[in-house]
Amino acid sequence: MALRLLQKSLLAAALLAGSSVLALAGGTLRIGMTASDIPLTTGQTDNGGEGMRFLGYTAYDSLVEWDLSSADKPSTIVPGLATSWAVDAADKTKWTFKLRPGVKFHDGSDFTADSVVWNLEKLLNKDAPQFDPRQSAQGRSRIPAVASYKAVDPLTVEIVTKTPDATLPYQIAWIMMSSPANWEKQGKSWDAVAKSPSGTGPWKITAFVPREKAEMVPNPDYWDKARVPKLDKLVVVPLPEPSARTAALRSGQVDWIENPAPDTVASLKSAGFKIVTNAYPHNWTWHLSRVDGSPWNDVRVRKAANLAIDREGMKELLSGLMIPAEGFLPPGHQWFGRPTFKLKHDPEAAKKLLAEAGYGPNKPLETKILISPSGSGQMLPLPMNEFVQQNLAEVGIKVSFEVVEWNTLINIWRAGAKHESSKGATGMNYTYFIQDPFTGFIRHLQCNLAPPAGTNWGFYCDPEMDKLFDEVRSTFDPAAQQKTLEKIHEKYVDEALFLMVTHDVNARAMSPKVKGFVQAQNWFQNFSSVTMD
């Protein structure tokens, strides 16, 4: 698999070098992604957070968006296509979203409350003519709170949740708005829309070639004039293999690469390239299966695995481009709380716990883990997982890997540990977006969000944890909600619910010609301020 991806990466780099449309031009920025293919262009992207970064929040908008203007503070949600939202004081399941007037899709049609309803239908209503299984697979699990919705007037939408849920605005931030009129124009075919998409975002997608490139140009009529792009063109190219990305940057075939290989950072700096990093809400974990027969059902085994990891050694492997995990959340996070289990490197304590669980030199724990060779937020999964594998072997846990492409891993994650696609694996290396209560905590472990209802891949179920999740959803006071979130994180750590290894620093390498980029503490980024010398 890794060899095939390398061949595809080198082919993409060759196509990039020979393509006349990608020739250097004034104001053209070319970015090498870690994804192995161009993300879906129809609104709800695939390829994880990277898909949303490059083909979601560029060409599309949501009702609620993230403030990406600052590198110095964590992002917060801000008005997008909705100017305001509020929960009904008498009925905490009823939300009203007031929409921004005068917004148009790229095809010139109006954005209205009917557009919002139409887009929710494309994800949630299998009987709707515009229902798209591919987009639904990406978006449905993002909005599990939604029970119903309606247009109240052209600029007002009402959304009703299944139960009171204070996390709804964070869920809605994932839902991109595609043009209903464009879908009609394209013969009611999402395949046709993919080639000629229409959103309301600051960028317009003008070219799309699978596994080769996507091109975007500014939307001069964008509703937020401060975010009208300054570039002439933005081009994204899939280059999943780190050495191919680095080679493309050094040769001038791209101007910017995501996630440079750590062992190239010093030489890239000495060659005049910029290395940009920042903390962001990310973790690099193994999500552990809790189905019957999984060795991870024993807390002693989970704690032993966490104590086996030499996180400082991994930091050295990555040339310092990581933050060693002290929990599921990064150190200093406002929801960190005071967990009592410390994620230190203590192989002897790990061996003792494994012995208590019935394992030893004559009876090693043997298991299989799903991993990918690349992918959004996955950092450098092959050498990192091999490092973890070695650490675990030293205490008596023998791990074999099933290597699958990133998008395939996402599909396995959505299918769940009980599905045949998991191939008997008891865990998967999966990185998580942890910048809000729902995507950071609830979706991973709530009982009723096990597949196919949601993305609780491991089928974990604990009524005590569910009670805490319910408290978060029903608590609309931020200070009170924070106390509950701290308790949740303490439980995540003290019960070692994941193998918690590291947090990324979101490294990017770019040409000195790239100016004006502000790296937000977020999975998503604003490219509108960027210029090229």
State where each predicted segment sits:
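Surface-exposed binding/hinge segments that line
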Residues: 98, 135-183, 207
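Ligand-site clamp/hinge motif
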Residues: 188-191, 221-267, 398
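N-terminal lobe/hinge region of extracytoplasmic solute-binding protein
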Residues: 33-90, 198
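A bilobed periplasmic-binding-protein/Venus flytrap-type ligand-binding module shared by bacterial periplasmic
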Residues: 66-67, 217-221, 280-304, 504
